[in-house]
Structures are given as structure tokens and as C-alpha cells.
């Protein structure tokens, strides 16, 4: 008997196991860890999971949902094979583990949605975290649309923890039909502000999280315009089930204690157009977090960046680009687009709007003593959602901080 289970996995008998699990036993979900495939067999992830998906589909079981567990974001290919994928090492019932997993998922919102999710691992509610840490754990899993699997003994769970797990407003947030993952719109000091649409895309209702992962009190000053909310704004605390006073003056001010979160449902009189699009919101088709390839495209910290992050190692080939898929304009028209980038010699940048002719930017700053430089170009946006792509098909592109949009007066 092999205590490590070597030889007992799917490898080599996919059809046999799939027949048993899905045809005979009738299961419709399977979580597939990569145990042994990388360490002992040195298999390639995309190829291996594709073989398993094909074996299941060949049985007429295309309805079966797969969860890929490679303990890191595996790559954009996962979306074609699975409904969800793990993005981190296994969770532990410790604050450091919860914080680490949230950190891993802060900039992966572009890969969630339309029935596909970044899996932050099972819930450790009721296993020793402090009450405010449990609120962070459950609240952030909900607003980031992670699958929710209870990981504690329900016969011994504390009453306060059980009450949190049964919070209908947080569960509704997680199960919102749009299925979107909240993204970071502000990172100042140690605090993060995340937001996402709920109920209706481009509607007046949004979910917002003020998240303090630090060990000290954190002050938040959140302008409503960065949340794209205009006019009078109502807010409801989804953890405490309390309506808050109407937000006046266009700014939400709060202080949060260490290891805490405020999860809000916010409703405004009108929805505003975004004027800033961060690089860390972009979809990167060549991105993965496996760490196998040096100089591969990545979201990277940069203190001087508007949101504290940049995208590095763009370009070098046509398919290695950054893409913002929902750049919204109410009426369409002419805009000035200002791109903030990190100067570097011998770099170019191609910009493409709605798959039309590329704009080649080669008159760019190479002064590496500048932390951030910018260039402004005219662009035409159609009414509704627009797709903006940046990269370079023939050389490395510049690292991107963000771009801003300003409508040209007619």
C-alpha cells in the first residue's frame, strides 16, 4: 500500500475513472489537484488538463464542472476547460494565510465572470480566526465571487461564526447573477478599496469593500467619482445589516481597525463614466502565476503608479498584449487618451481601439530617472463598450501604469 497515493490518480486511466464518477455515480463536479503531475511526472499543465476535459466530454458529460488546482493562477487557457481554478497555496485558519490569498486575487478580476471564477480555497470560518478577521475572510470571498465551500466542523462551530456563514446579504453578493469579481480602485497607505457592479451592468448599484489588512488603524477617503457614483448616494453595511447615513459632499470617510473590512451595497442617483483605467484591470492573455518563465508578463508593484501597480513585460510578440474590454462611453465621440508609463530606452508601444488601425507610439521618453512619464493621443470611442489594446508585436513594450480619458468638447 502506497501511503502517498502514487499511481492512484487520474493519470493513465482517465476514461475508466470518468466513467465511474460521472456515468455510474452521477457526480457533476470534480476538483483536480496537480499532485505528482508536476513534481514526479513533469507534465505540462494545459496539455494535461485538456486531456482530462476531453475524456470527460467524450463520455457525453460536458455538463461536468472542473476545478483546476495548480496552487497558482494557471493561465487564461483554464477558462476553456474549467469553471474555476485555485489561485494560491492551500488556506490555513490563520490571518496571514487569509491575507496572502486576498493579495493573490486582488488583480485577477479580468479573468472572472460569465460563469468562471478565481477560487480562493475553502472557508476557514469557525476555526480560530478573530471575529473581525472572519468578516474579512467571508466578506472578501463573497465580493470577489470565490466559490464558497465550508471547511469547518458544523457540529462545533461557534454561534457567531455560524451567523456569519448564514449572512443572506453577503451570500446574495457572492451569488449575484452578474458573477463579477471586485477590482481595486484605490490603494492608499495600507488600505484597499474594491468595487464591482451588481444586479445590472452599468447600473446605479455597486458593491464596495474598504479593506484594511494592516496591523494598525487605517483611514479611508473615497471620492464617489472613483466608484463611478454621482449625486446622492445611499449605502448599506452588508455585514451588520445596517443602512448608513446618506453620503454627502461626494466623499466617503471612514477609519477601520486592523484586520477588518467594510462591505457596502451602494446606490446612487446617477452612474458616471470612468476617467481612469488602471493597467492592473487589464486582461493579459499570456499571463500566468506559475513562475516557470522569466520575463513573462506580470502585474507588479510600483509605488509611483496611480494605483500602486503596473503591468510589466508587455510585447515582444503580437499576442502578448494588455486589453481593457469594457471602456465605456455614454455617447461616444472624440477623446484625449493620456497613457502613463515607465520610461525605458528602446521601447515602443502600439495602441489599438476596437480592433481598428494600430497607433504606433515611438516618440516616448527614455529618461529612466523619471519614474512615470505620459503621452496623450486622440482616440475615437463608440457609444457603449470599447476595447482598447496595448502592446508591441516586434519589441518589448513599455511598462504601463494606467490611462485616462477626457472627452473633447464639441
Predicted feature locations:
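Active-site-adjacent "subsite" loops/lids of carbohydrate-active enzymes
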Residues: 1-38
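Loop/turn elements at helix/coil->beta-strand transitions in domains of secreted/extracellular proteins
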Residues: 25-30, 60-65, 204
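Stable alpha-helical elements in mature extracytoplasmic
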Residues: 14-18, 48, 52, 136-139
Amino acid at each position: 500500500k502506497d501511503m502517498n497515493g502514487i499511481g492512484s490518480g487520474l493519470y493513465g486511466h482517465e476514461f475508466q475513472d470518468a466513467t465511474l464518477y460521472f456515468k455510474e455515480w452521477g457526480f457533476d463536479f470534480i476538483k483536480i489537484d496537480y499532485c505528482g503531475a508536476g513534481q514526479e511526472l513533469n507534465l505540462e499543465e494545459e496539455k494535461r488538463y485538456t486531456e482530462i476535459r476531453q475524456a470527460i466530454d467524450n463520455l457525453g458529460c460536458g455538463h461536468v464542472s472542473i476545478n483546476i488546482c495548480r496552487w497558482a493562477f494557471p493561465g487564461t487557457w483554464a477558462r476553456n476547460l474549467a469553471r474555476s481554478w485555485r489561485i494560491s497555496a492551500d488556506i490555513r485558519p490563520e490571518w496571514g494565510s487569509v491575507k496572502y490569498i486576498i493579495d493573490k486575487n486582488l488583480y485577477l478580476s479580468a479573468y472572472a465572470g460569465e460563469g468562471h471564477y478565481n477560487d480562493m480555497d475553502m472557508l476557514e470560518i469557525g476555526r480560530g480566526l478573530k471575529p473581525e478577521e472572519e468578516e474579512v475572510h467571508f466578506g472578501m470571498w463573497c465580493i470577489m465571487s470565490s466559490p464558497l465551500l465550508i471547511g469547518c466542523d458544523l457540529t462545533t462551530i461557534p454561534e457567531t461564526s455560524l451567523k456569519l456563514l448564514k449572512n443572506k446579504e453577503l451570500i446574495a453578493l457572492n451569488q449575484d447573477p452578474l458573477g463579477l469579481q471586485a477590482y481595486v480602485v484605490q490603494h492608499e497607505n495600507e488600505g484597499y478599496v474594491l468595487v464591482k457592479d451588481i444586479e445590472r451592468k452599468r447600473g446605479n448599484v455597486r458593491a464596495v469593500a474598504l479593506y484594511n489588512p494592516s496591523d494598525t488603524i487605517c483611514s479611508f477617503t473615497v471620492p464617489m467619482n472613483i466608484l463611478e457614483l454621482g449625486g446622492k448616494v445611499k449605502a448599506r453595511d452588508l455585514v451588520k445589516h445596517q443602512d448608513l447615513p446618506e453620503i454627502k459632499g461626494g466623499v466617503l470617510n471612514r477609519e477601520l481597525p486592523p484586520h477588518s473590512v467594510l462591505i457596502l451595497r451602494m446606490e446612487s442617483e446617477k452612474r458616471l463614466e470612468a476617467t481612469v483605467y488602471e493597467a492592473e484591470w487589464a486582461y493579459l492573455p499570456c499571463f500566468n502565476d506559475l513562475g516557470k518563465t522569466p520575463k513573462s508578463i506580470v502585474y507588479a508593484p510600483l509605488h509611483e503608479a496611480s494605483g500602486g501597480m503596473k503591468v510589466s513585460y508587455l510585447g515582444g510578440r503580437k499576442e502578448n498584449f494588455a486589453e481593457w474590454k469594457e471602456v465605456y462611453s455614454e455617447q461616444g465621440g472624440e477623446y484625449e487618451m493620456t497613457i502613463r508609463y515607465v520610461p525605458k530606452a528602446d521601447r515602443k508601444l502600439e495602441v489599438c481601439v476596437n480592433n481598428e488601425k494600430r497607433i504606433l507610439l515611438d516618440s516616448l521618453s527614455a529618461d529612466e530617472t523619471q519614474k512615470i512619464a505620459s503621452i496623450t493621443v486622440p482616440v475615437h470611442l463608440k457609444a457603449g463598450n470599447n476595447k482598447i489594446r496595448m502592446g508591441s508585436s516586434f519589441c518589448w513594450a513599455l511598462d504601463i501604469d494606467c490611462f485616462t480619458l477626457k472627452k473633447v468638447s464639441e
